[in-house]
Structure formats: C-alpha cells, structure tokens
Amino acid sequence: MAGQKIRIRLKAYDHEAIDASAKKIVETVTRTGARVVGPVPLPTEKNVYCVIRSPHKYKDSREHFEMRTHKRLIDILDPTPKTVDALMRIDLPASVDVNIQ
C-alpha cells in the first residue's frame, strides 16, 4: 500500500474523549511502522438553542443552551496491512464518531 493515505476524522461532544481517542490511534499507528500526521484540531462547531423559560408568556425570559462538537483529523501515510489490521481492532469510546476515508 505504498503511496497511499488513510484519513481519519473524529467527532465528539467531549474534548477529553476525543483527545484520548486520537492519542490511542496515533500510538497504535506508530507502533505498526506507519507515519502519522496529526491529530489536527479542526474548528469546533457550536450550536446555540434559545428556549423560552415560561410555557405561556414572559417572552423576554429566555434560556440559552449550547452544544459544541469537537473535531480532529489524523492522516496515516504509507499504511501497511499490519496498520490496517491494528486500526480495525482498536477499541474507542461510543461517544466518539469515527469516519475513515
């Protein structure tokens, strides 16, 4: 698989979980002999929801909630079959969304 590249995108609401997962992936890949670029922090997506506190009136009294989606990008250069096998076996938390290209 010389000259190829695997791109892994991680998404999570918890920044500690995504950093721990990225560290685990980088350690696994470097142990198998492939080169790693990253983890590269991508812009955090912030969704803000505005909710009226009262069910009927008092429209001026509102509450804001926000959800932050943290993202990381990891590139694996020149992966070996051993690297791909190790990535398939790695155990990551359910709160981290992994997209492999």
From Swiss-Prot:
Gene3D superfamilies noted in UniProt: Ribosomal protein S10 domain
GO biological process, one term: translation
A GO molecular-function annotation: structural constituent of ribosome
Annotated InterPro entries: Ribosomal_uS10, Ribosomal_uS10_CS, Ribosomal_uS10_dom, Ribosomal_uS10_dom_sf
GO CC field: ribonucleoprotein complex; ribosome
Quaternary structure, from the entry: Part of the 30S ribosomal subunit.
Family per similarity comment: Belongs to the universal ribosomal protein uS10 family.
Protein name: Small ribosomal subunit protein uS10
Organism: Corynebacterium jeikeium (strain K411)
